[in-house]
A protein has these predicted regions:
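Short glycine-rich anion-binding loops that position phosphate/pyrophosphate groups of nucleotides
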Residues: 14-15, 61-62, 101-104, 111, ...
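Glycine-rich phosphate/diphosphate-binding loop of Rossmann-like nucleotide-binding domains
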Residues: 21, 38-44, 144-210, 219, ...
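Short glycine/serine/threonine-rich phosphate/pyrophosphate-binding segments
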Residues: 17-23, 77-91, 95-109, 120-125, ...
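N-terminal phosphate-binding or glycine-rich loops at protein starts, especially the Walker A/P-loop
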Residues: 1-46
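Glycine-rich phosphate/nucleotide-binding loop
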Residues: 110-137, 217-221, 225-336, 342-346
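Short, glycine-rich nucleotide/cofactor-binding loops
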Residues: 9-21, 73, 142-152, 293-300
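Short beta-strand segments
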Residues: 12, 40-41, 57, 98-100, ...
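Phosphate/nucleotide-donor binding subsite
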Residues: 50-93
Length: 346
């Protein structure tokens, strides 16, 4: 492990919508907990120094959301996210974190860290901002178009990660669809349902509907990247609207204000659980290294939590344990290996 006292995280210094100040504050907060942070960005704008437990690696070029991610990653060898991914690949850091372009982060991580054996497409997985037992949701943006076999792979990847990192024993896995019946949904969902229902080594509970996402009907919920991204942002927006409405109602009259005052501790805890910053970000599953895609609008606490998520994933050997769990059982091996020869993803 690169860091003598704990994990080392390579943090992309560009891309945070709240600017260099929030990124620097988040890096300092994570470093104060013993996480070594290497920030790739412009030293003067970041205003960080080695004494704070953070090392700044000069980088002055970035890849934005307006850029075509894959060509940009290949062409801009000195872009911050490319340098950070290379830092992990070369063994100087244990994990990559970026709050910049999702596409660029995925491309840089995939090129630099490489996919696990048998994995066709890495998937972005996020712990949903819901109270109670953790619910892992994937894919939330890496793969807009998928086939049944990809959904099956995502199911095994998500189940392995949920058990290894989130500590959920024998996680229940569901497919997001428009109805609970096995025949409901697009053809790839119907086909994936049939494959998973017949597979061993996974606790498949069938289809789940959108209303079931926050209710714990499954510990791992699988869908394509387009649907997942829309659903995740809808949940984030709804949570923000609900907490805002509660605050507004509590100020509507003196009696409501008194009730709001009495409820403040409980509502504060609920708000923290629903806050997207609390999850840290989405982790790219299926790679031979750790890569976390943080929310672009994250504040300092969200940035620190993304670094913490990456460091925790290193501490518990998420990659090794996920790979080991995937190797257990013929169903898991078959689900991953049967798609390797698919020329469409070569």
């Amino acid at each position: 492990m690169p860091g003598a006292g704990g994990p080392t995280v390579a943090l992309d210094g560009f891309g945070a919508e709240r600017g260099f100040e929030a990124l620097a504050e988040g890096a300092r907060a994570a470093a104060a907990e013993g996480i070594a942070v290497r920030v790739f960005g412009p030293p003067e704008e970041l205003g960080l120094d080695r004494a704070e437990g953070v090392k700044v690696v000069p980088a002055f070029e970035s890849i934005g959301n307006e850029d075509d991610a894959v060509p940009a990653v290949r062409a801009r060898r000195d872009a911050s996210v490319v340098l950070a991914a290379r830092d992990v690949a070369e063994g100087n850091a244990d994990a990559l974190v970026s709050h910049g372009s999702t596409g660029a982060t995925m491309a840089a991580a995939t090129f630099g860290l490489r996919r696990m054996r048998g994995v066709q497409r890495p998937a972005l997985a996020v712990r949903l901002p819901v109270p109670g037992k953790p619910v892992l949701f994937l894919d939330v943006g890496a793969n807009v178009d998928v086939r049944a076999q990809h959904l099956v792979q995502f199911a095994f990847l998500g189940a392995a990660f949920s058990e290894a990192v989130l500590g959920v024993a024998a996680p229940r896995v569901g497919l997001l669809s428009v109805g609970e019946e096995a025949g409901k949904g697009r053809q790839e969902v119907v086909d994936a349902n049939a494959i998973l229902a017949a597979a061993s080594g996974i606790d498949f509970v069938g289809n789940v509907e959108g209303r079931d996402l926050p209710g714990g009907a499954a510990d791992v919920v699988v869908t394509d990247g387009f649907t997942g991204n829309v659903a995740l942002k809808l949940m984030e927006g709804t949570a923000s609207a609900v907490t805002g409405a509660i605050r507004g109602a509590a100020r509507s009259n003196p009696l409501a204000a008194l009730g709001g005052l009495l409820m403040r501790p409980a509502l504060g805890g609920l708000r923290r659980e629903l806050d997207p910053d609390a999850t840290g970000g989405a982790i790219l599953l299926g790679l031979r290294g750790i890569a976390v895609v943080g929310h672009g609008g994250a504040g300092a606490e969200g940035i620190a939590n993304a670094v913490r998520l990456a460091a925790h994933s290193v501490d518990v050997d998420a990659v090794g344990r996920t790979a080991a769990l995937l190797r257990e059982g013929d169903a898991g091996r078959g689900a991953l290996s049967s798609a390797v020869s698919d020329p469409a993803d070569a």
